[in-house]
């Protein structure tokens, strides 16, 4: 969907660690990097680290929720990353971060971080113990004020499930094509439609019992 290029004039430029709500395909146009990736998705693999060097002969796929970082090892390194979602302010709210210098991660940077070039923002990212896991994609429930919608909401609240949003016709009429643009659909992984025209009481009438 969107291809980005980061040109690094001097070796030692170090960026990260950023987990974003999209997949990335990373390649190097010129130069070489040391890459470090940290799993920031909730679960048993949270905090696991993978490192490798990339040059123009190699590329790597980074799934959604895995923190990405790199260090330029040559002057004039061009780092490219193809992503499968467009940037948006709503997407940015879901980013999560961890500090490049976290001793728990113990990333073996080829150029010591104190000799590297880092941004002010990257210097102040939290350590892993304070990092917020990347939330999974959201689930939207439409028709939430009907019988089925209420049952779904009760189940979600009883079981403490996270990431659910509830809409009824007054906030999202899915029969109206003009209303779809109010949502960034890349943030959602599941849609549950609990809305329909029903007349349950007619089942108790002669008309409802042919």
Predicted regions: what they are:
Residues 163-182:
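Adenosine-cofactor binding site in Rossmann-like domains, unifying the SAM/SAH pocket
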Residues 54-73:
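Conserved SET/PR-domain catalytic core that frames the SAM/AdoMet-binding pocket
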Residues 138-159:
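N-terminal Rossmann NAD(P)H-binding glycine-rich loop of SDR-like oxidoreductase domains
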Residues 1-54, 74-78, 83-137:
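Non-catalytic, conserved peripheral segments adjacent to functional cores
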Residues 70, 149, 200-201:
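Glycine/Thr-rich phosphate-binding loops of Rossmann-like dinucleotide-binding domains
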Residues 178-210:
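NAD(P)H-binding glycine-rich loop region in Rossmannoid oxidoreductase-like domains
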Residues 142, 167, 191-195:
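SDR active-site strand-loop-helix element
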């Amino acid at each position: 969907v969107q291809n980005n290029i980061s040109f690094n004039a001097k070796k030692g430029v170090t960026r990260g660690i950023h987990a974003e709500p999209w997949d990335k395909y990373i390649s190097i146009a010129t130069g070489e990097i040391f890459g470090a990736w940290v799993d920031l998705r909730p679960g048993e693999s949270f905090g696991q680290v993978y490192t490798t060097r990339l040059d123009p002969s190699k590329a790597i796929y980074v799934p959604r929720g895995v923190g990405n970082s790199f260090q330029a090892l040559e002057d004039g390194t061009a780092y490219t990353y193809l992503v499968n979602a467009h940037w948006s302010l709503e997407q940015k709210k879901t980013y999560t971060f961890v500090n490049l210098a976290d001793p728990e991660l113990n990333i073996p940077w080829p150029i010591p971080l104190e000799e590297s070039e880092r941004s002010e923002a990257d210097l102040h990212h939290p350590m892993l113990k304070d990092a917020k896991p990347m939330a999974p994609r959201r689930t939207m429930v439409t028709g939430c004020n009907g019988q089925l919608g209420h049952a779904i909401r009760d189940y979600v609240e009883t079981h403490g499930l996270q990431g659910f949003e509830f809409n009824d016709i007054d906030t999202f009429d899915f029969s109206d094509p003009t209303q779809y643009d109010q949502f960034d659909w890349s943030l959602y992984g599941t849609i549950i439609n609990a809305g329909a025209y029903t007349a349950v009481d007619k089942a108790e009438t002669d008309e409802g019992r042919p």
